[in-house]
């Protein structure tokens, strides 16, 4: 992907200079764990000398884009991804530092705990993972932007996409609490609990707009640099596992 990006970006700085500096947006698609490839793409764009005026993302693209928009460099993002305890983050386990040794040993026997309701025998909160640990991480990483803010006033103007399960509509975040917007955009249905916000039930934006070029254009972009890491469509016979169906949503 790096070489394809270089081929596409090689002459763009000259085009921008000749055109009187039009606005450039980077659009980052959803794509599950493959979304970390967005970090490498941003590094290539920077190395090519392309100015970035807007960042728009969905799902994992919203996470990378949101952090990049407030000043994280690709190198910092890469280090952050590699330094995380993903088993802990992708669970509702308490922080090991706050757990007694006996309880910690019991919890480490299981990769994933599923909270069932004894009354209804259903998975609680419409998702296996409530996402508290991820939400806490996002809040920490966005320190200084924890109040409701206008995303157009971030160091790089930003927007991300979610879906309102109440009516199936697309929700584009242009303002609000940045960590909440990022968490809403990657709430994979059936995996992460949705985010309740202002009467909406928000989940991963991948089904309504997984590659939000239109959002970037509406923000004022003249040129779009799109980074699409979506998986190719699977045949019906290939959708055999629940994880296949879940990941196809992003």
What are these regions (language model features)?
Residues 9-18:
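Hydrophobic h-region of N-terminal signal peptides that target proteins for export
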């Amino acid at each position: 992907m790096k070489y394809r990006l270089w081929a596409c970006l090689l002459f763009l700085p000259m085009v921008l200079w000749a055109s009187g500096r039009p606005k450039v947006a980077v659009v980052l698609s959803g794509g599950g764990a493959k979304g970390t490839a967005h970090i490498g793409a941003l590094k290539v764009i920077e190395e090519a000398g392309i100015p970035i005026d807007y960042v728009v993302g969905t799902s994992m693209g919203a996470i990378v884009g949101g952090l990049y928009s407030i000043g994280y460099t690709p190198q910092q993002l890469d280090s952050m991804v590699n330094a995380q305890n993903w088993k802990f983050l992708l669970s509702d386990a308490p922080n090991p530092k706050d757990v007694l040794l006996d309880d910690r040993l019991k919890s480490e026997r299981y990769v994933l705990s599923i909270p069932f309701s004894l009354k209804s025998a259903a998975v609680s909160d419409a998702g296996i993972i409530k996402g508290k640990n991820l939400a806490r991480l996002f809040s920490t990483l966005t320190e200084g932007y924890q109040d409701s803010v206008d995303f157009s006033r971030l160091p790089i103007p930003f927007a991300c996409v979610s879906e309102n399960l109440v009516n199936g509509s697309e929700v584009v975040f242009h303002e609000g609490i940045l960590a909440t917007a990022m968490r809403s955009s990657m709430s994979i249905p059936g995996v992460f609990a949705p985010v309740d916000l202002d009467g909406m039930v928000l989940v991963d934006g991948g089904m309504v707009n997984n590659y939000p070029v239109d959002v970037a254009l509406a923000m004022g972009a003249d040129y779009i640099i799109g980074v699409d890491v979506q998986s190719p469509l699977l045949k019906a016979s290939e959708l055999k596992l629940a994880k296949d169906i879940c990941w196809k949503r992003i």
